[in-house]
């Protein structure tokens, strides 16, 4: 729209020059155009929350040349359009602070260029009203602006006398009844230098940030970088949160993957803890202890994801617009400590399992297993405490969890020791592979069977080591390219300044597929542990024993109940028999006594006879 407007102005100027050949324009004056309906109005004022030209206008904003323009079938004031243009100009100047001098003067000049002071013809040359005419910026002012900031020459051409006359502008008002000076009405150009010199020491450069960047005061402790704000030097503009490396759809895919896979892995890890740590009473081995502790540590990692998604992932990572979470945010500090403890403890036990496996295969007598437990726990606690004490737990930009982001801390307290541990694990795995190869020659069937039993723990350690190796490579690849990523932010800003939006402009970051796989590997360990150990024969036997013991216990209780019932029945039956026997005995005795009595009576009777 602005280009069309400039073209029309150029066309009108050509017509005026051709038609006005008989008029003699003064040297040093530009040719002006009179727009019917133009008015001298007060400055409409700055937008709320965004200072622009208040206190920077030549005449204090009392009279500004104003017209009405038709845009999308709506009449819009030229002042409103100028506010849009001046905001874009200020946004560009904000990012030129380290390349230009005296930008404050440039802002004064741009304000007068876009909000031209307005003069009215005196006396009235029309019956009803004065003719309103703009005062243009002097050429010397334009040249000073371009001299201080050569980049402005790409947008401003000081040789255009229509905009930047040396002395003033002449307007042909013959159509309006003006006859003096052959109908040419002279309006002097303006030079804000004197006004600028009087108040410049009381003014500051106005900074403006293109959307979606946000403007913050970096000198205010509330908005300092250690609070989670990422500033774009030399400005006070901060990047959005999360980092605009990817589209909103791509970020959503990462969030959905993490949410789904973390939930599944957490359940799988809890299953392993329940199986090998709680229900297992008869198979207390070093392997099972390693499985339990690895599952516990990795469950802690996935618990942080459950907390995040319950809290709201975007609210968790970005508590405020433009600010990423830091350790002072309670949720970030707690989950960061849990994440570091869990991931470090898992690495320690992966190394421990590989050592135990190697020693078992090589028949090497291992020192007390509890030494591993003490060492792994102390190391993990110490590194976690150091990071918390240094307040290094942050969400950062372009990540989906709170953890340590400072290069030397994360290398010293995580990647270096864990890299050494994984190297030991890989060495032990190599020894196991070599031993399996030797045993596979059928030297001893019994020993071969023993070695083959170690395939699952070997697979687990190999998978964990391989996954961590990818994470290791990805991390250092990102660190290697971090400077190029930072340099590419300039292209992102240029895209925004050129009229781009958050849907079309992006910063440069790690390849999206690699980024997605990085977080996939971190969240797949729980499923991996379950697929190797949770479905093993040992796990099935543990559950079978638990179920069998429960069934046997219930059967035993049932049999005991039946036995007690039978005992009661037998006692009752015995009592009845005794009663019957007693009665029979009594009846027999009575019968005998009766018979004896009869016999006795008979004998008596016989004796009597």
From Swiss-Prot:
Signal sequence residues: 1-20
Basic and acidic residues bias locations: 599-609
Residue numbers spanned by region Disordered: 559-609
Domain FZ positions: 35-192
Keywords: Disulfide bond, Glycoprotein, Membrane, Receptor, Signal, Transmembrane, Transmembrane helix
Membrane topology: Multi-pass membrane protein
Cysteine pairings via disulfide bonds: 40-118, 53-111, 100-149, 138-189
Residue ranges annotated as Extracellular topological domain: 21-259, 310-337, 387-408, 479-511
Biased composition (Low complexity): 575-598
Residues that carry a glycan: 75, 130, 172, 198, 217, 245
Chain segments annotated as transmembrane: 260-280, 289-309, 338-358, 366-386, 409-429, 458-478, 512-532
All ranges on the Cytoplasmic side of the membrane: 281-288, 359-365, 430-457, 533-609
Cellular component terms (Gene Ontology): membrane
Subcellular location: Membrane
Bias kind Polar residues: ranges: 559-570
Family, per entry: Belongs to the G-protein coupled receptor Fz/Smo family.
UniProt name for this protein: Frizzled and smoothened-like protein E
Organism: Dictyostelium discoideum (Social amoeba)
